[in-house]
């Protein structure tokens, strides 16, 4: 089994940033929208200046203007823009020529998810599939039925897109998710303790993931 790409999202302090930068993650996610994990572009800029890392940086936006997204992506040299609101395929198409970043669209798991993936395919580089919880955009800590993960993975791979699975992923559930062979995993609350990223949880998650991958080749 190929090791999935990993994104640690909701980084909200220099300490979080340092832990994630030293981890085995591929992507570090920053939320620029209303959330308990919200940060400012200025904060992220300071962390980037003080901590050297080769991790890719993802900015998460919710119903933000195209102009503001493009400006923040340019100022921070974001590797990825994640559209996590009610953005349309047309919004993603309008954003494309304004940025150098990859564009991902977050979609909620449901009956229409595969159709939405197809609709966004011409305009984005990847997807984040998350649980559908009324009144919440993400960071719920609640998993959806991972039996559908192979369908999402296949559709994304056929279109040459990245696909991350989010919602309810933590050290206790990671093995169950890996059985579905996701190509990407996205975590926020699953590696937090008392609202902060936790080194012990990160280490435990990565140990279990690496072990499963090593015995599944």
Curated annotation (Swiss-Prot):
Catalytic reactions of this protein? N-(5-phospho-beta-D-ribosyl)anthranilate = 1-(2-carboxyphenylamino)-1-deoxy-D-ribulose 5-phosphate
Sorted alphabetically, the keyword list is: Amino-acid biosynthesis, Aromatic amino acid biosynthesis, Isomerase, Tryptophan biosynthesis
Cited InterPro entries: Aldolase_TIM (IPR013785), PRAI_dom (IPR001240), RibuloseP-bd_barrel (IPR011060), TrpF_fam (IPR044643)
Pfam families for the chain: PRAI
This entry's Enzyme Commission designation comes to 5.3.1.24
Which terms does the UniProt entry file under GO BP?
L-tryptophan biosynthetic process
The biological pathway it contributes to is: Amino-acid biosynthesis; L-tryptophan biosynthesis; L-tryptophan from chorismate: step 3/5
Q: Which domain of life is it from?
A: Bacteria
State the Gene Ontology terms under molecular function: phosphoribosylanthranilate isomerase activity
List the disulfide bonds in this chain.
Answer: none
Q: Which NCBIfam families match?
A: PRK01222.2-1
The similarity comment for this entry is: Belongs to the TrpF family.
| Protein name (database record) | N-(5'-phosphoribosyl)anthranilate isomerase
Q: Which organism is it from?
A: Bacillus velezensis (strain DSM 23117 / BGSC 10A6 / LMG 26770 / FZB42)
Quick one: which gene encodes this? trpF
């Amino acid at each position: 089994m190929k090791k999935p790409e990993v994104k640690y999202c909701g980084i909200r302090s220099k300490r979080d940033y340092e832990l994630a930068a030293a981890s085995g993650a591929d992507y570090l996610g920053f939320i620029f929208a209303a959330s308990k994990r919200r940060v400012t572009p200025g904060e992220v800029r300071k962390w980037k200046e003080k901590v050297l890392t080769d991790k890719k940086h993802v900015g998460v936006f919710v119903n933000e203007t195209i102009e503001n997204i493009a400006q923040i992506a340019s100022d921070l040299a974001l590797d990825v823009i994640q559209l996590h609101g009610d953005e349309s395929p047309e919004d993603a198409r309008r954003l494309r020529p304004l940025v150098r970043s990859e564009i991902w669209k977050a979609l909620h798991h449901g009956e229409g998810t595969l159709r939405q993936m197809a609709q966004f395919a011409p305009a984005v580089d990847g997807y984040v599939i998350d649980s559908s919880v009324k009144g919440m955009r993400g960071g719920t800590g609640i998993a959806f039925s991972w039996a559908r993960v192979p369908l999402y993975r296949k559709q994304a791979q056929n279109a040459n897109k990245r696909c991350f699975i989010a919602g309810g992923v933590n050290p206790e559930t990671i093995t169950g998710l890996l059985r579905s062979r996701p190509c990407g995993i996205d975590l926020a609350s699953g590696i937090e303790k008392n609202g902060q990223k936790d080194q012990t949880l990160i280490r435990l998650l990565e140990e279990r993931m690496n072990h499963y991958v090593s015995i599944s080749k």
